[in-house]
């Protein structure tokens, strides 16, 4: 009994420390990717094309690394992989201090940061306890969201004081996360040293076995990301609000999401499978309705209400969807499978803005992008709703 209690305490301590490490790395990512490089064209000679390329390469590196990181963790162990990641992130962001306007350094740092964050995410997802998955996944996604947003806001404030003087803060945050890692005992589901060909065959096998999940993983990210390029224009040109009022809408949505992740996500645990199905299906349908409604809104107060509803639903849909995916994963393939899932999700987030921007540009109508995003959630609702009904009938 005492050994069990000590083991539970150790697992809890490791989980909390990994949450803090995830928060710090996402904090650094928010500072650099969402704030620093976006402001560079306004305060230095860096061209917008360079920062846009850096932004894209960051997420390409992230998605590509996710595809193989689970296998690398099993082959080389967590210490080598994570330490390498911290070295890459720290070194690349440290270079920004000395070369704040170098196109090569800006792009290189973005790529290295994308690679470095990948193993931390995979370890977090594979270490969640099954009987507490909804609750713990709420904490994981909360740490991710809080880190990104606070990092972005914090760097925005520092840039207002001086555009490049506080660049050292980014590498400092990574260094703190790196030091904390040495107080964590990370355990994988198993270790193997299989040859590369065998690991490639396993990637193909994992992909084939989870094809049912890929539409949901890919299209959810694409549908949300498709709105990113048009939302600022929609807010300022259609609703005619200030940047501050638009920011308030984002903050309200973030607060709703945070509250849902911290308090509502635990509802997923110890509930029936049908309850989980209901949350997922309701989430897809509600998203479709809310996003479609955005195309007709011209009042900022109604927009704030919709932002709150979207945030609340997102905060419970993510853990529910994660729990649904987890039921398909073999216990000894946690790291590999979550890595592949994260990679597919990353590609969805990359193609979403591309489609959203192109639809608006070629149709010259912002509403068409809202219709596109809403249609995706309608397709997901029909596809997975049909699966849930068929699966429920088979279970009887």
From Swiss-Prot:
* GO MF annotation terms: antiporter activity
Report the domain of life of the source organism: Bacteria
- TM region positions: 15-34, 46-73, 80-99, 105-126, 138-159, 165-184, 211-231, 243-263, 275-297, 303-326, 338-358, 370-390
- How is this protein annotated for GO cellular component? plasma membrane
Report activity regulation: Flipping activity is inhibited by increasing concentrations of gentiobiose, a disaccharide with the same chemical composition and conformation as the anchor-LLD headgroup. Not inhibited by other disaccharides such as lactose, sucrose and trehalose at a similar concentration.
**Keyword set, alphabetical order:** Antiport, Cell membrane, Lipid transport, Membrane, Transmembrane, Transmembrane helix, Transport, Virulence
Q: Which GO terms describe its biological process?
A: lipid transport; lipoteichoic acid biosynthetic process
- How would you describe this protein's topology in the membrane? Multi-pass membrane protein
Tell me, in a sentence or two, what this protein's role is.
Answer: Proton-coupled antiporter flippase that catalyzes the translocation, from the inner to the outer leaflet of the cell membrane, of the lipid-linked disaccharide (anchor-LLD) that anchors lipoteichoic acids (LTA) to the cell membrane. Displays high selectivity towards the headgroup of its substrate. Plays an important role during infection. Contributes to S.aureus survival under physiological acidic conditions.
What's the family?
Answer: Belongs to the major facilitator superfamily. LtaA family.
Q: How does it assemble?
A: Interacts with YpfP/UgtP, LtaS, and with numerous cell division and peptidoglycan synthesis proteins.
Under what name is this protein listed? Proton-coupled antiporter flippase LtaA
> What species does this protein belong to?
Staphylococcus aureus (strain NCTC 8325 / PS 47)
